[in-house]
Amino acid sequence: QPVQATEREQAIIAAVRNAAPGHGLDPARAAAFFHDQIEANKLVQYARLSQWQLAGAAPALPRHDLQRIIRPRLDDLQTDLLHQLASFDQTRSRQCARKLALALAQRQGDALHRAGMIRATGQLCD
């Protein structure tokens, strides 16, 4: 499957905009947050594809079906993320950007996933 799935991304953003008011969120805020999640995911996917090209093969691991398993899980996660974003916004500190930077700096993991987290939270404190 290609990494870039413009129609799917547009459908997700439209669904998030529609669901946002039910969570007490501005549709533009929710759309920006989910846009960042999508872009972070693509950043990691493109990097992994590049690594696999260099290695000559993807890891020999079982792959989950995108249509039947992965996307339904992601759809369920949308509601949870909207709820968490609304909760975050209600308690957001004025020092959000600094606290976020500190939290990201303390995260474990490889450089690629740290970069993905930075991208995913790019507008979180706006």
In which residue ranges do the predicted regions lie?
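Generic structural signal for well-ordered, non-transmembrane alpha-helical segments
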Residues: 10, 14, 35-38, 42, ...
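Short, charged low-complexity intrinsically disordered segments located at boundaries
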Residues: 15-24, 46-50, 65-69, 105-116
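N-terminal Sec/ER secretory leader and immediately downstream segment
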Residues: 1-36
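Extended amphipathic alpha-helical interaction segments
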Residues: 49-90
